Amino acid sequence: MAKRKTLWRGLSALFAFVFTLSCVAGTILEGYKATIDTNLGTQSEKFVSENTADDPLYDKFTPSAEVLNADGTGNSHALIQKAIDLGHKQAVEGAVLLKNENNTLPLASGSNVTLLGIRSHISLLGSSFGVKAKGPYISLEQALSQNKTDFHNTIAYTLNTNYKTGEVTRALSLSEWNGDEFEFEGAGFNVNPTMVDVYTKLNETYQHSENETPFANYDPQEPSLAEVKATNPDYEASFAQYGDAAIVVISRPTAESKDYLPGSVAEGTGASEPLELTTNERDVIETAKKASDKVIVLINTANAVEIGDLKNDPDIDAILWIGLPGCYGMLGVADILCGRVSPSGAMSDIYATYNLS
């Protein structure tokens, strides 16, 4: 009897060992089946389809006739127009109105407005790593004041990083453009050309792009008022003619696998956190208050920039979060500012007005 118990114990132990070994081996073999098949000339799996010409398993996708030429090839102009319409709609549905006091928004048709902040000229449309905004785009200035474009001067730039050397280069996201002209419905405003020229010249030095990424010891690189004045000493004189509203754009780039770390902000910016407004950004906002009785701030980022002070400032009339609107989203922003549509977006969570809360 004792011998039988010993036998069964031995067999049980052996079975348990073989079972465990089989499970481990099976997992390993399954994980490396492609390598094993290549070396042994075996085939672990085979896809069998019942698809036939008479009875297709899948229906072939056929684009709608409105985006096709007569010969059935794709009509690039129509396809781009569809992309413009989609980007426009996404921005309308995604923008969030965080503040609107004194019936500031919507602005009346034909309003004379001043755009302030270098990001009002070179807005962030996408990310340099992850989701990029590539090719032609419609700028905020165009969306507010124009109704057609050939994209001659609005091809998005992006920053390319060499991860071996750490070198960052700025380059066009599209090397060629066929020059097609596209029509759109702008807001019908008149935009201060003086400030557009100022920021155009300043960006020759700053080299901002429409796609950027956060970096250690971050500096949003908003030009100082001294730099603005050096570019055009009489820039403030333009406010009298374009003082119906002052629109300030505040931006922070966003990227896949990139975060703003606590305290990771460049020295000399006047900020202690990367999502806090810098001295130069605050100066731009104060300039907006001098330029107009109506001050509107556009939050051009996917991050929660610290806007508690702006929320509580009685001189800031409206705050509109526009995220990263993509190549054609500024058309939706323009629609909201002129009252053609009502902003219907909502935040997915509580907006933290303090970075370390």
Task: State the predicted function of each range.
Residues M1-S357:
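C-terminal non-catalytic regions of proteins with extracellular/luminal or membrane-system context
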